Regions:
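Acidic (Asp/Glu)-rich catalytic clusters
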Residues: 22-23, 84-92, 119-125, 206, ...
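Active-site mouth loops of central-metabolism enzymes
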Residues: 32-47, 101-108, 186-196, 302-310
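Hydrophobic faces of well-ordered beta-strands that scaffold small-molecule active sites
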Residues: 28-32, 64-66, 96-98, 126-130, ...
Length: 357
């Protein structure tokens, strides 16, 4: 007997599976890279991630997501499924998930087993966003894939199809995997999103009736058109299914102008370091030096790549961007700044969002 279909938000909403039960949650999420601050260890970073998740849950955010990155001494997010489990037990209502799981790095069966286990632990609260990028450098990707040469463009659709089959779509009669199951066997599925920072992800999501999540923080020039096209070209997997999208945006909200400058300088340094293959945590004095330089201050422009400033301004601008992209949710990305300042920014933004919406 064919297993139930999965992968679209509206079907899951109709049957009450895989969606938040928070009727008053905001259409806001947090994407956390679980950064390791200078001078601290990974244990402190993971504990800090729990603190952030609990703070944004209390502030009314709908989701808390962690990323998958490898070979980064400045990040503690190489095993997002474990972070989800750790955060899940110390929160009560916010949805927790990965944004994403880089599917070419993993066997689809193993991903299905991990997320079914998470759903058994935290029913109705687990999200799974899928990506096709490696989340790391080429050599690390080679090791993760045990030397297998992967062509994501050619192989990714098949990997997604296999994952959906393990999660509930089922394999066709006579398929060699049709007698196997992804254990534990449960009646619930994670809420699925397809990640993208190019046209590929939203197009794939539209053609396959999936939720879409676009990384404005990586490709700001493509985001709005890509998500509008996704909504216009959405093909439902089942009658009545509707498009559902989220857009991640670099944002920092504070009344403190120096804190805003530090965030902008920190992100500028992070990008510069990545281009030079420097993966260590930022030194606070580096950030202060850049933020205090006249050259940096004079070059600050409102180029649309990030939204920073007083909470009222940030909330109003994000609402405008949400409408412009025809997105259902905004995913806030706030790296390269101290955890205390991140938490304060998230809380201030939520308060300002309620007043502005």
């Amino acid at each position: 007997m064919r297993r139930s279909r999965v992968g679209n938000a509206s079907l899951l909403r109709r049957i009450g599976l895989g969606v938040s039960t928070q009727t008053e949650s905001l259409p806001l999420a947090v994407l956390d890279f679980v950064g390791i601050e200078y001078g601290e260890n990974a244990a402190a970073s993971v504990a800090g991630a729990v603190g952030i998740a609990r703070a944004v849950e209390a502030a009314g955010y709908r989701r808390y997501w962690v990323s998958e990155h490898h070979n980064m001494t400045s990040l503690a997010c190489s095993a997002p499924e474990l972070l989800i489990a750790h955060v899940g037990v110390q929160t009560s209502s916010i949805r927790v998930g990965a944004a994403g799981i880089m599917l070419p790095n993993h066997a689809p069966l193993k991903v299905a087993e991990m997320f079914r286990t998470l759903l058994a632990m935290y029913p109705g609260r687990i999200d799974l966003a899928l990506g096709r990028a490696p989340g790391t450098d080429p050599l690390t990707a080679h090791v993760l894939r045990r030397g297998k040469v992967v062509d994501p463009g050619a192989e990714f659709p098949g990997q997604v199809g296999e994952l959906l089959a393990w999660l509930g779509d089922g394999f066709g009669e006579g398929h060699p995997y049709s007698q196997l199951v992804a254990a534990p066997v449960i009646d619930e599925q994670p809420e699925l999103f397809m990640l993208g920072s190019s046209q590929y992800g939203p197009k794939f999501a539209a053609l396959n009736g999936m939720n879409a999540a676009f990384a404005h923080h990586m490709s700001p020039d493509l985001a709005f058109e890509a998500l509008r096209d996704y909504r216009a070209s959405f093909e439902p997997r089942s009658p009545g299914d509707e498009p559902y999208s989220a857009m991640s945006v670099l944002a920092f909200a504070s009344e403190d102008e120096q804190a805003v400058l530090d965030f902008e300088a920190g992100w500028t340094l992070t990008i510069a370091n990545l281009r030079r293959n420097i993966r260590e945590p930022l030194r606070p004095e580096q950030v202060r030096e850049l933020a205090g330089s006249e050259q940096f201050r004079s070059r600050r422009t409102d180029d649309g790549k990030m939204v920073t400033g007083e909470p009222k301004f940030v909330a109003e601008r994000l609402l405008e961007m949400k409408e412009q992209a025809q997105a259902d949710e905004i995913v806030v990305v706030t790296p390269s700044v101290s955890r205390d300042r991140r938490e304060a920014s998230y809380v201030a933004l939520a308060d300002a969002w309620r007043r502005a919406a």
